């Protein structure tokens, strides 16, 4: 399931009295939102201001919860809420929900049972390392034993979620490489840049051995939750550089030589 494009299912849409579909531009990424009747929005062209007032805190709360349950990131929900007057208490409520979700016990790692946010931070690391779902399952899968059913179920759910992240990332990468490669592969220095342009920069970085942390600081201007980072439009570029850097390091590493068997061993 693709998180960044996920739109509320028909059964959830029915919870809204009247639905008006609008498009909110997030640095070139078109994200489709739904709003309940009672909210008014002034729409403008590129570069124009948009303002809005919510009919009630209740309707805005319903929308925020709807987006939260639809796996939209906290940054996207915040941008939506900030278009409406009286959004502060709703924003505080949603922030609390994100904190509670991030604190849920989610997965067993080397250090034991960890929270969702800790596990998702690990998801980011695995993606940058190029780990497949199969590799993660081999490393962190829990064997089924009597009395161990709940742990197995929890672990399988987390590993499946990692697989969903990979599936989503592959879809986004394909879209950028095949539909927006010429103009909007990433957002840097206040503008969208092409895939060819950024690959040229990445090639120079990889040749110089520029650390991944430097690329991260260029692509993401502020700290954010792992899930929010994953949904950022620059994440595909981040993963692209990580892959280029891995390949460069591999190409200059001396070949592995197994020890020559001797009589003593």
Curated annotation (Swiss-Prot):
Keywords (A to Z) from UniProt: Glycoprotein, Host cytoplasm, Host nucleus, Secreted, Signal, Virulence
GO cellular component annotations of the record: extracellular region; host cell cytoplasm; host cell nucleus
Signal peptide range: 1-25
Membrane-spanning parts: none
Residues bearing attached sugar chains per UniProt: 71, 148
Span(s) of short sequence motif RxLR-dEER: 32-50
Main localisation: secreted
Intracellular or extracellular location(s): Secreted; Host nucleus; Host cytoplasm
Domain notes: The RxLR-dEER motif acts to carry the protein into the host cell cytoplasm through binding to cell surface phosphatidylinositol-3-phosphate.
Annotated function: Secreted effector that completely suppresses the host cell death induced by cell death-inducing proteins.
Family, as annotated: Belongs to the RxLR effector family.
Protein name: Secreted RxLR effector protein 146
């Amino acid at each position: 399931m693709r998180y960044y494009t996920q739109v509320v299912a028909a059964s959830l849409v029915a919870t809204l009295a009247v639905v008006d579909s609008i498009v909110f531009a997030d640095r070139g990424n078109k994200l489709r939102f739904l709003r309940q009747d009672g909210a008014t929005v002034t729409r403008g062209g590129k570069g124009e201001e948009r303002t809005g007032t919510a009919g009630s805190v209740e309707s805005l709360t319903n929308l925020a919860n709807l987006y939260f349950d639809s796996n939209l990131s906290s940054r996207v929900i915040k941008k939506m809420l900030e278009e409406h007057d009286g959004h502060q208490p709703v924003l505080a409520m949603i922030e609390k929900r994100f904190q509670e979700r991030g604190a849920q016990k989610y997965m067993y790692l080397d250090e034991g049972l960890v929270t969702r946010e800790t596990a998702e931070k690990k998801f980011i690391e695995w993606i940058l390392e190029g780990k497949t779902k199969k590799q993660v399952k081999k490393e962190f899968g829990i064997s089924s034993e009597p009395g161990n059913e709940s742990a197995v179920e929890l672990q399988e759910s987390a590993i499946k979620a990692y697989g969903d992240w990979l599936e989503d990332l592959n879809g986004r990468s394909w879209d950028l490489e095949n539909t927006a490669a010429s103009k909007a592969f990433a957002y840097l220095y206040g503008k969208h840049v092409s895939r060819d342009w950024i690959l040229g920069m990445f090639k120079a970085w990889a040749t110089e051995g520029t650390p991944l942390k430097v690329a991260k600081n260029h692509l993401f201007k502020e700290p954010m939750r792992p899930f929010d980072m994953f949904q950022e439009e620059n994440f595909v570029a981040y993963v692209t550089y990580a892959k280029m850097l891995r390949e460069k390091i591999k190409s200059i590493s001396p070949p592995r030589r197994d020890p020559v068997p001797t009589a003593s061993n």
